[in-house]
């Protein structure tokens, strides 16, 4: 009888030990699986884009409004806007409080006081060489000048795109353009640019390297010249060095957070660099030119539409630059 009881107790103990071992084995296996699963999630999460179902509540000073779920916040609630204008606009308005007035008007379009900055420039040529663009979104007002239509389109090309430039010593060296993004930019009070293409023996093609009068004239008496020649061919260059400078530049890509508003003029300027593409006229606004107050009122009215086709502090090489006319 006692032998049967001891056997029963021993069987129960063995069962408990075996069950405990099975449970520990299952626990260790689950820990291993969960650890590997979490590790996999941690590794792939930076490469996965998913919908954010959180609530985005921008701080505007008051939260007594209903906000809908969105993955992208309203740009004018969280961003800064710089408006660049010619000094003549400020002189014509002649009102010490005009910027404050415009700030109040921008407030009606959703731009908080202090988020819009007004900056004037004396000369658009100087401004375009190295534009100081400080804000998330930058809008440049450029007055149309019928005496320099070509210069205006090239100025827009400088402002709307980012360039990397180096000085050129045309008295010592030949130069060639390596790609369609490689241009020679000349600027000064009077720029006349002449070029002589060279063959592989550095002899002039249709010109004499020793006689600048035989060079081809690509620009005459202009303030700004963006010279585009045949790629991969050496050129001897001649410019009026006393009144003009020249630089070898590469276009890095568009400044997507910059737009230009052309003020006045009968036609919108086309700044398309590639003649095989459709002209960039689909993003142009136009109104009749009257006075600078009228210009600024129109800018306030349309500013949010302009912002929607720009990118905040971005410089993607795949997107187009933007040019507007009012």
Swiss-Prot record:
Transmembrane segments: none annotated. The keyword Signal applies. It comes from the Viruses. Glycans are attached at residues 69, 146, 238. Disulfide bonds join 82-135, 165-249, 191-244, 196-207. N-glycosylated. GO terms for molecular function: metal ion binding. Residues 253-255 are annotated as: GPR motif. The keyword Signal applies. Some rotavirus strains are neuraminidase-sensitive and require sialic acid to attach to the cell surface. Some rotavirus strains are integrin-dependent. Some rotavirus strains depend on ganglioside for their entry into the host cell. Hsp70 also seems to be involved in the entry of some strains. In group A rotaviruses, VP7 defines the G serotype. Homotrimer; disulfide-linked. 2 Ca(2+) ions bound at each subunit interface in the trimer hold the trimer together. Interacts with the intermediate capsid protein VP6. Interacts with the outer capsid protein VP5*. Calcium-binding protein that interacts with rotavirus cell receptors once the initial attachment by VP4 has been achieved. Rotavirus attachment and entry into the host cell probably involves multiple sequential contacts between the outer capsid proteins VP4 and VP7, and the cell receptors. Following entry into the host cell, low intracellular or intravesicular Ca(2+) concentration probably causes the calcium-stabilized VP7 trimers to dissociate from the virion. This step is probably necessary for the membrane-disrupting entry step and the release of VP4, which is locked onto the virion by VP7. This is Outer capsid glycoprotein VP7. It comes from Rotavirus A (strain RVA/Human/Venezuela/HN126/1983/G2P[X]).
